[in-house]
From Swiss-Prot:
Cofactor: binding details: Binds 2 manganese ions per subunit.
Organism: Staphylococcus epidermidis (strain ATCC 35984 / DSM 28319 / BCRC 17069 / CCUG 31568 / BM 3577 / RP62A)
GO terms for MF: manganese ion binding; phosphoglycerate mutase activity
Matches recorded under PANTHER family: 2,3-BISPHOSPHOGLYCERATE-INDEPENDENT PHOSPHOGLYCERATE MUTASE
Positions that bind Mn(2+) 2: 12, 62, 438-439
Catalytic activity: (2R)-2-phosphoglycerate = (2R)-3-phosphoglycerate
Name of this chain's protein: 2,3-bisphosphoglycerate-independent phosphoglycerate mutase
Active-site residues, Swiss-Prot/TrEMBL: 62
Length: 505
């Protein structure tokens, strides 16, 4: 007899917001979501700031969201942890950072600092760059070259000049540091093995090849004149003493989120890299703020804090069969991040990865691979052996990042169609679904004056539990979702999970 599965369905980047203006969630025709919302118990939970282990007021993101969801507790994020280490001075005593400085001194070489130059807080924070500059100043090294990656996605599309000016003020104040190269994150921070993009960023950084400008500001302004926003700024070099990354140099990459920092790091550190032809740098000291992946051979500045008894581990220990399913863009989130930073499958776990479409930007194909994800899940449900399903629909977030209202509405409508088939099937099997999200985005894709808004929001996310006769708590946080799943599965919640079931008892 087929099992009665319990599913967690994450509509990525889908939150509650009162105003209809620029709100694709409100404007989309979503009869299935609305039907479940009217029929079943609902609540809303917090998905940003202190509730997910980020600084107060900081918007959530997919990595943070899935980690909190899977852990069933507040997970203090790298950003909060690094900020704290800078505030209490531990940062300046960090062994790896000081080893990088020592390497530069011993070799009479240069320190290169890579990272996303913004205060978006999703991948990095530019104040961490300032702390590295302060460390260099304290240690008396003068050749410090900053290779800045421009954001325009987690912050305003044209905000780079503000960060560049503040960084140049810091160079002057400390008497240390200069910009060496600048690239839009589209090139330097790809995560889909589009090596042609990475190659352009790499050539600017490593070989000092590319368009040349007298200053970082001049290069960005030239791009703006051609209607190129920060994310897409073509890699360029800044005139100065730097001549690229050379033998004996050191690199500190201050992005703390791994997924978009791994590829560039792999090019520099993995001798087996074959995405394009590279000349390896000899005697290079390469440090990354966190562990990016197993293909990156680097010293780790902030080692991972292990998370035990995440939802996947608890399912395994209770002999449950679980499925993780998503398309490429969100696959690491339902696997690695949901498992607390673990790549290996648990016993009884299987995974389905559906390829994301190969398009330049997802507004060109708002449905992405939602229908294929849905079909794959229906196929898995037909096997009748699943207890737990962890599913992500990427569309509201990935299309929401375009800052375009119509495609984002289409994205949500496509997901709603798929949601209906999936949830109805689970209910027909006697199972239950929790429909929710990991953070906001598609709830506001236009600013009040109709400019594209490509960032996440701090709005609370909806929760629908398709079980009649229960009452949900009025509020909660992402860390309460795993305990709610365990509640539906009648599985005891481990002590490490400090979240609380959203179901009132």
């Amino acid at each position: 007899m087929a099992k009665q599965p319990t599913a967690l369905i994450i509509l990525d980047g889908f939150a509650n917001r009162e105003s209809e203006h620029g709100n694709a969630v409100k404007q989309a025709h979503k009869p299935n979501f609305d039907r479940y919302y009217e029929k079943y118990p609902t609540t809303q939970i917090e998905a940003s700031g202190l509730d997910v282990g980020l600084p107060e007021g900081q918007m959530g993101n997919s990595e943070v969201g899935h980690m909190n969801i899977g852990a069933g507790r507040i997970v203090y994020q790298s950003l909060t942890r690094i900020n704290k280490s800078i505030e209490d001075g531990e940062f300046f005593d960090n062994t790896v950072l000081n080893n990088a400085v020592k390497h530069v001194k011993d070799n009479g070489s240069a320190l290169h600092v890579f990272g996303l130059l913004s205060d978006g807080g999703v991948h990095s924070h530019y104040k961490h760059l300032f702390a590295i500059l302060e460390l260099a100043k304290k240690q008396g090294i003068d050749k410090v070259y900053v290779h800045a990656f421009l954001d325009g996605r987690d912050v305003d599309q044209k905000s780079a000049l503000k960060y560049i000016e503040e960084t140049e003020d810091k160079f002057k104040e400390l008497g240390v540091g200069q910009f060496a190269s600048v690239s839009g994150r589209y090139y330097a921070m790809d995560r889909d093995k589009r090596w042609d993009r990475e190659e352009r960023a790499y050539n600017a950084i490593r070989n000092f090849e590319g368009p040349t400008f007298t200053s970082a500001k001049a290069g960005v302004e030239a791009n703006y004149k051609n209607d190129v926003t920060d994310e897409f700024v073509e890699p360029f070099i800044v005139e100065g003493q730097n001549d690229g990354v050379n033998d004996g140099d050191a690199v500190i990459f201050y992005n703390f989120r791994p997924d978009r920092a791994a590829q560039l790091s792999e090019i520099f550190t993995n001798k087996a890299f074959d995405g394009f032809k590279v000349e390896q740098v000899d005697n290079l000291f390469y440090a990354t703020f966190t562990k990016y992946n197993d293909n990156v051979d680097a010293e780790i500045v902030f080692e991972k804090v292990d998370l035990n008894n995440t939802i996947g581990e608890v399912a395994q220990d209770n002999g449950l069969k679980q499925l993780r399913i998503a398309e490429t863009e969100k696959y690491p989130h339902v696997t690695y991040f949901m498992s607390g930073g673990r790549n290996e499958e648990f016993e009884g776990e299987r995974r389905r990865l559906i390829d994301s479409p190969k398009v330049a930007t997802y507004d060109l194909k708002p449905e992405m691979s939602a229908y294929e994800v849905k079909d794959a899940l229906l196929e898995e449900l037909d096997k009748g052996d699943l207890d737990l399903i962890l599913l992500n629909f990427a569309n509201p977030d990935m299309v929401g990042h375009s800052g375009m209202l119509e495609p984002t509405i289409k994205a949500i409508e496509a997901v709603d169609e798929c949601l209906g088939e999936v949830v109805d099937k689970i209910i027909d099997m006697g199972g239950h679904a929790i429909i929710t999200a990991d953070h906001g985005n598609s709830d506001q894709v236009l600013t009040d004056d109709d400019q594209p808004m490509t960032t996440h929001t701090t709005n609370p996310v909806p929760v629908i539990v398709t079980k009649e006769g229960v009452t949900l708590r009025e509020t909660g946080r992402l860390g309460d979702l795993a305990p709610t799943l365990l509640d539906l599965l009648n599985v005891k919640q481990p002590s490490e999970m400090t979240g609380e079931s959203l179901i009132k008892h």
